[in-house]
């Protein structure tokens, strides 16, 4: 398998863009592998500029839940493009997608469309602070909520301490309004509320942590968040940018039966086009301009192409879609465990709907500290060999893999065999 054209393309890209990319993970640095430039996709497959074919488990980092080049989505996008790409005014497409989102997401009575997941979480925190009149936000270690300043925060020296900047350029003054506690740890959360409860506006959480490699909530964790935030008058915010419509037909909140006050969405609701959204109770959402005084705006918010793609994507998902994801996930999980056991390599497999995470450790993995015990060197070696086998995986141990309705049992069986072949060469 040749990567010659991708290597040359990256050399040129590095002269034009920082690191040659427009999002750091695309540089493949964490797996010490040359970046792969893609050309096109079809169904469950993706093709690079060297002509190599891969079974795709990245799916544009989650949005392509129907696979590449879904014909219904493409056809409706052609119709939308023929009418124009953006108008700076409202369109019927916004109403259609909003109605569908409100119908399926238990917590959302009103929704505001934006252009990215980062924008959704940023605006949601502003809304939570404005609504409650409080300043502090609690987030969980290992949960990623986009790259806004107040969320690029790591934990301090102890449990439930005020945050410290996790990136140059984030002022300490902003970081000090973010409290970071371990994921799946209600005791630490209670300590934070006991110390700062009167000034905590909200708790933001990925109901399934998708940016430490897919870590589901332990039993009672999400309900505990709901109970504690209710007790202290803080808002519970679910960041479902990744989990939205991937964990279940009614998102993670429907699957786990816990309803937050506010929800952030993205990825799947754009069907591969740039989009984000946030929504919640009418009482809270009506604090946003032009009805309320909390300002939020966006030139391309509710873009008709993104709204069309999102609507046509969600309209094809049914409860049966998630039964299909579970059936494929069962086969993949069983196959992975058998192959890794054959080669005497430890593996932990975590699943949530169409999201699957595997860790090269003994497990269990319920938080960021446990995820960090994975064998990162082995992961990098395996990643390179899997690419040679024609399987495109996320180039990071701390990113989940995704299934689509376009994936088949044959894809899964080929993937299991590819892992067997790869491990045979490196173990």
Curated annotation (Swiss-Prot):
Protein name as annotated: Glutamate-1-semialdehyde 2,1-aminomutase 1
Protein family per UniProt: Belongs to the class-III pyridoxal-phosphate-dependent aminotransferase family. HemL subfamily.
Pathway(s) of this molecule: Porphyrin-containing compound metabolism; protoporphyrin-IX biosynthesis; 5-aminolevulinate from L-glutamyl-tRNA(Glu): step 2/2
UniProt source species: Staphylococcus epidermidis (strain ATCC 35984 / DSM 28319 / BCRC 17069 / CCUG 31568 / BM 3577 / RP62A)
N-terminal signal peptide: none
Cofactors (names): pyridoxal 5'-phosphate
Keywords from the UniProt entry: Cytoplasm, Isomerase, Porphyrin biosynthesis, Pyridoxal phosphate
Gene3D superfamilies: Aspartate Aminotransferase, domain 1, Type I PLP-dependent aspartate aminotransferase-like (Major domain)
Organism classification: Bacteria, Bacillati, Bacillota, Bacilli, Bacillales
GO molecular function annotation: glutamate-1-semialdehyde 2,1-aminomutase activity; pyridoxal phosphate binding; transaminase activity
Chemical reaction(s) catalysed: (S)-4-amino-5-oxopentanoate = 5-aminolevulinate
PANTHER family in alphabetical order: GLUTAMATE-1-SEMIALDEHYDE 2,1-AMINOMUTASE, GLUTAMATE-1-SEMIALDEHYDE 2,1-AMINOMUTASE 1, CHLOROPLASTIC-RELATED
Subcellular location: Cytoplasm
